[in-house]
Amino acid sequence: MSITVHIQYAVPKASVPLQADFLRWVKAALVNQSKAGEITIRVASESEAAQLNWRYRHKEGATNILSFPFEVPSCVSLDVPLLGDLVICAPVVAREALEQTKKEQAHWAHLVVHGVLHLLGFDHQQEVEAQQMESLEVTILESLGYPDPYESV
């Protein structure tokens, strides 16, 4: 499996994880997948995340992560599949980590893994789907050395 991760920064790089961390988290989420491809991660400001959240989900305010799976039109053939885009709001991630008394790096890892699973088609709208997705997230994060993000502190 070959994966390319493009990182776009709309906030200062000093306030976000290293590109190598993003790549490690994406690869961990894809470890049991045979899919090769490309993913773009945009590290957004709060205003940009709020605009995108309103445009695509009709919800006010910034959210921590938005996932945009790429659907290839049937008339298009790609050498390297585009898996999709993730938009992660750096200020929301920092605030949530503080509020939830989590290490910020662990929260970033969780959100990247969560987003990649959405790009692969996982969802959490129904209880059974949520349990399956959360279980997979916990397993992936533990393989990276991070604690269960759903465990109460």
Curated annotation (Swiss-Prot):
GO cellular component, one term: cytoplasm
Pfam families from the UniProt entry: YbeY
GO biological process: rRNA processing
Subcellular location: Cytoplasm
EC numbers, comma separated: 3.1.-.-
Cofactor(s) listed in the protein's UniProt record: Zn(2+)
Residues at which Zn(2+) binds: 114, 118, 124
Gene Ontology MF annotations: metalloendopeptidase activity; RNA endonuclease activity; zinc ion binding
Main localization of the protein described in the UniProt heading: cytoplasm
Cofactor mode of binding and number, as noted: Binds 1 zinc ion.
Keywords noted in UniProt: Cytoplasm, Endonuclease, Hydrolase, Metal-binding, Nuclease, Ribosome biogenesis, rRNA processing, Zinc
Similarity section: Belongs to the endoribonuclease YbeY family.
Its job: Single strand-specific metallo-endoribonuclease involved in late-stage 70S ribosome quality control and in maturation of the 3' terminus of the 16S rRNA.
Name of the protein this chain belongs to: Endoribonuclease YbeY
Protein species of origin: Nitrosococcus oceani (strain ATCC 19707 / BCRC 17464 / JCM 30415 / NCIMB 11848 / C-107)
Gene behind this protein: ybeY
